[in-house]
Amino acid sequence: MTNNALLIIDVQKGFINEYTRELPGKIEKLQNNYANVYAMQFINLEDSMFRKQLNWHKLSLNTQDTELAFKIRPDALVFSKYSYGATPEFIEYLQQQGITSIDVCGQSTDCCVAKIALDLFDNRILPKVLADYCASTTGRLVHKRALISLRHIIGKDNII
């Protein structure tokens, strides 16, 4: 833990597989080390590019797939998102709260974790990616490669 704020990205039932199944339990415990906990929850809208271009239809609105795969703290704030990245509203909220650095965990390291880390970085909020609390649905090798890339892009000291 390097901050008093934790961002949990897309740890949802529809993303749990053989590569990510241990993540919910680890994050459920981890969240208790923070004063402020935020979660991002992906929803695949009917007109999304995920459907149109990738023919990917999971995590539709109001389905069990979109539910968080762990018991989140009652005082945590959950933000919906409809793409790989952070919403402008979420970034603005963090800025209004005076948050300048935040620990980041979740899935998938190579997609949403990386994109949101870059969104935070671009908006002058320093992401600290907790490598052992991230995973990729496509496997450990992809997770490791994403961490290598993030070390270069946001700084080696920001991957913990």
Language model regions located:
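A short alpha/beta connector and helix-capping loop motif
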Residues: 2, 19-46
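Active-site flanking residues adjacent to catalytic metal/cofactor-binding acidic residues
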Residues: 9, 40, 131
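Active-site-adjacent betaalpha module
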Residues: 1-5, 14, 25, 29-33, ...
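A short secondary-structure junction motif
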Residues: 46-59
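Short acidic, Gly/Ser-rich segments with clustered Asp/Glu that frequently serve as metal-coordination loops
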Residues: 11-18
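Short Asp/Glu-rich motifs
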Residues: 18, 47-50, 139-140
